[in-house]
C-alpha cells in the first residue's frame, strides 16, 4: 500500500481527524539511518505523528519540527514535516538495542524521561515553540498530552510500527482525532467510549485496514474528504 494521509470531519464540525499509512516513509528512514528495530519503531512513530501534524499547517511554506529529547539510550529524535505531507527525521543513536519488556519493544525505556518540543516556523520573526514533558515516552501519549496542554485541543493519538522478522518495516501508520470547540458533552462521551473500544494501530494495520477504515471504526460518520500522498 502506498503511503498517504486522509483528513476527515464529522458531526457538523464537532470533530476532525487524520489517519495515515507510512510504511514507505519509515522503511526509507530505516535504510537511510541503518536503525535497529527499536529505533525504527520509535522514529517511525514520531515520523507518522509529525506527518499528520504537518498537514495541519496552513501555508505551503510553513515548516513543523517535532523533537524528543530524553535521557534514554536512543538519544534525541528530530523530525521535520511540511503541509504537503513530506516528512523526514533522524535519531541520535540509531543502533540502540534493549531487551524486550513484557514481550514488547521497550520504547519508553529507549526514550527515557525528557521533553517533547514542537516548533512551528510560519514565517514570523520567531517560530512558535511548545514544550511539554514526556508523560509515557511512548510518543503517541506524549503527542496527545502536547495537544491538550500546549494547543488546548482535546485529542487522541494512535501510532504504530510493525516489523518483519528480517527487521524491515511490515506496516506503519496512525491517527489523530481532535475535538473542536463546538463539541457537545453528549458527543464527547460517545466518541471517547468508541475510541476506548478500538484495537491498537498495529493490530488494525496488521489486519489490512486502510486509513479510511481506521477512521470509520474510530467514529462511524468520519469520512475522508482529502487525501495527501507522496510523503517521502
Segments from the language model and where they lie:
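Interaction interfaces in information-processing and related assembly proteins
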Residues: 1-219
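N-terminal cysteine/histidine-rich coordination modules
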Residues: 229-232
Amino acid at each position: 500500500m502506498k503511503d498517504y494521509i486522509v483528513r476527515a470531519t464529522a458531526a457538523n464540525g464537532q470533530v476532525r481527524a487524520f489517519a495515515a499509512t507510512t510504511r514507505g516513509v519509515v522503511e526509507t528512514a530505516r535504510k537511510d539511518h541503518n536503525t535497529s528495530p527499536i529505533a525504527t519503531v520509535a522514529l517511525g512513530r514520531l515520523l507518522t505523528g509529525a506527518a499528520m501534524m504537518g498537514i495541519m499547517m496552513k501555508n505551503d511554506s510553513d515548516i513543523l519540527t517535532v523533537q524528543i529529547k530524553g535521557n534514554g539510550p536512543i538519544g534525541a529524535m528530530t523530525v521535520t514535516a511540511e503541509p504537503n505531507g513530506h516528512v523526514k527525521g533522524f535519531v541520535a543513536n540509531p543502533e540502540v538495542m534493549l531487551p524486550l519488556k513484557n514481550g514488547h519493544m521497550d520504547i519508553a525505556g529507549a526514550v527515557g524521561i525528557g521533553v517533547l518540543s514542537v516548533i512551528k516556523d510560519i514565517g514570523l520573526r520567531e517560530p512558535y515553540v511548545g514544550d511539554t514533558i514526556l508523560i509515557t515516552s511512548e510518543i503517541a501519549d506524549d503527542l496527545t498530552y502536547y495537544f491538550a496542554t500546549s494547543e488546548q485541543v482535546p485529542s487522541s493519538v494512535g501510532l504504530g510500527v510493525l516489523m518483519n522478522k528480517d527487521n524491515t518495516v511490515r506496516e506503519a501508520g496512525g491517527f489523530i482525532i481532535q475535538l473542536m470547540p463546538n463539541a457537545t458533552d453528549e458527543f464527547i462521551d460517545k466518541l471517547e467510549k468508541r475510541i476506548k473500544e478500538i484495537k491498537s494501530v498495529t493490530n488494525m494495520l496488521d489486519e489490512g485496514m486502510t486509513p479510511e477504515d481506521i477512521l470509520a471504526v474510530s467514529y462511524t460518520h468520519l469520512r475522508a474528504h482529502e487525501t495527501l500522498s507522496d510523503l517521502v
